[in-house]
Amino acid sequence: MNQTQSYMDVHTSHFSSPQPYGSHGATAGGMVPYSHYQQPPPLLPPGSAGYPSTPGSYSYPYSNGVASTTQPASNSISSQVPAQILPLPAMTSHTVTPHGYVSGAAQSQQNAVHDPTGQTCPPGAKPRVTATLWEDEGSLCYQVEAKGVCVARREDNHMINGTKLLNVAGMTRGRRDGILKSEKVRHVVKIGPMHLKGVWIPYERALDFANKEKITDLLYPLFVHNIGGLLYHPANSNRTNMVVHDSQQRRLEGSQTARTSQGPQAPALHHHHSMNGSVPSHMPQASASTPQTNGRPELNRAHTFPTPPASASSLIGIPNQGSTYDWNSQNINSTVQTSQNVPIDNGLNSTRSMPTTPATTPPGNNLQGMPPYQNQPAYDSSKSYYSAAPSSQAQYASQPLPAHSLTYGQPMMKDLGSSGRPPLGPVEQEHDEVKVDRYNQPNGQVTNGTEEENGQQQEPEYVQDNVAGSYANRNSYTYTTNPSVSSLSGDHSQLGGSPSHQNGSDRMTPRTAGTNPPPQWSQGYNTPPRAVPAGSISNIVSDTRGAPNGDSYAPGTAYASNYSGYSSVNGSSMGSTKRMRDDDDDHLSRSDGRENEYETKRRKTLTEPPVGGAFMQMQQQPVPAGGVMRRR
């Protein structure tokens, strides 16, 4: 403090008290006007060493002016911001009348640096100055009102609100903003009280604008250097002292916090003590009771914030430490293989001031009441829902058509009888328009309703689901091996009239269905509904002699002869001319929709699975409406 005080007093004594230079004679008088700008304090004459011992001797020249009250304030301010007082060197020179040569030098110095206008009170004017604390900027502001506009001036750097200043001059907004934008030194304030918003400009530029606009006398005492001295009215001196002291205190705190925040040690947040049990030893342990020495209030954040979940270190690979609350190294579902105990934070101090809510209560003594996890394998092989897919197909064995097998929201077959067969008659009427749409069947033909056609409602565009199931679970299908089928030599499959003969989808032909119902109907539907085999006349003429194990899926060569123009149909030994007439009608009705059928095949090939798609496509093409026989 003594060093800065001597620095401050030497600067003020150059133009106010020349007595310490009495031993130097005439050289001191010639040195006074230049030493203020050119000589730093270490290069002063040897007489300056005695300045700190007599600090009270420098206040006597100010006994006849108002600046005597500001001398202690300037000393206290200079300890923090000494450079901010220097722009106003002639602060008290107009009131001080010391020896002649010093006052002349100081007066010439003032004329060279500052404009004297705005310093004297105009005749008849009554100075009105108010002061307010600008909390956002941490400064005291002096305010002068003129023409209903409040113009403010900061105490710390003496900048003036240029926007309000030019508003007093009555300047238009465009011209005002253009002038203020061209200023090199300016400070734009957009947040705060209305009278403090605007563009702040330095003191000298504001005084130039006021002189140009001839509003200097209106704004008196805004430009008075010692504007703070005008606040010392006998009626409100106590309040003014409080305001100035508060402003200085805020400035001191601001500079102190700015200094301490740049220090080597950041302020500790005391959050580490909640992780005492799991933090490695190389991490600094900050005690909650250690007071801080950097001047800022202590932040006990760990007493007000909830405990971090699992202390954030139980998830990191930290060396195993014995703690009081452990999870007993249970392998949860045998899938998480932990090599060490997972510690829950146990360093919770008793100084916590939180309610014991479920979110903040540590897993403490109530942990013993928790039942341990059962050590069980991740997948139970005995459960059917974890087993392989083929065994799950057995649930379709003796059910006609389960409701959940109708995937993708296809219409459910509502008219199934007790034997699992659909009725043969007028059920097809509700689906007739669909078949006309797809196969170009004439509207006059009413076809018999077989299970193939009812299964057709489930089949379009979703064939790959059932195809994949039929390939994957081929062994679960129970195709009945009929000796009557295997003993057929060359006859047509429907000429034999055997009631036990079944086509590929476990159904009987309509001719033999009514006379002798077979016993195989109860166990025929053992699979989910799959696509219909053999979509052409080959369903009637299909040669099943070469199929192994009675499976009606014949090799591809069996279908090649049937697709070659139906020569085998007309050339085979038919039993009756009535059946040949039916086949001829069927062939004619098939020839109309032939082109559409191939288009349907091509479209559906795109939706088939890649494995076996072409071969399954031949077998899954449905029998069209007139393919089996027409009802008489």
UniProtKB/Swiss-Prot annotation:
Induction remark: Only expressed at detectable levels in conidiating cells, but not in vegetative hyphae or yeast cells.
Gene Ontology BP term (one): conidium formation
Keyword check for DNA-binding: yes
Cellular component annotations (GO), alphabetically ordered: nucleus
Location of the region described as Disordered in the Swiss-Prot/TrEMBL record: 1-27, 246-315, 340-386, 403-460, 473-632
Keyword check for ATP-binding: no
DNA-binding region: 162-183
Location, primary (coarse class): nucleus
Region Nuclear localization domain, annotated ranges: 578-604
Stated role: Transcription factor that regulates asexual reproduction. Binds the StuA-response elements (StRE) with the consensus sequence 5'-(A/T)CGCG(T/A)N(A/C)-3' at the promoters of target genes. Required for accurate spatial organization of the developing conidiophore. Primarily involved in the formation of the uninucleate sterigmata, which arise by budding in this multicellular structure. Required for metula and phialide formation during conidiation but is not required for dimorphic growth.
Protein name as it appears in the record: Cell pattern formation-associated protein stuA
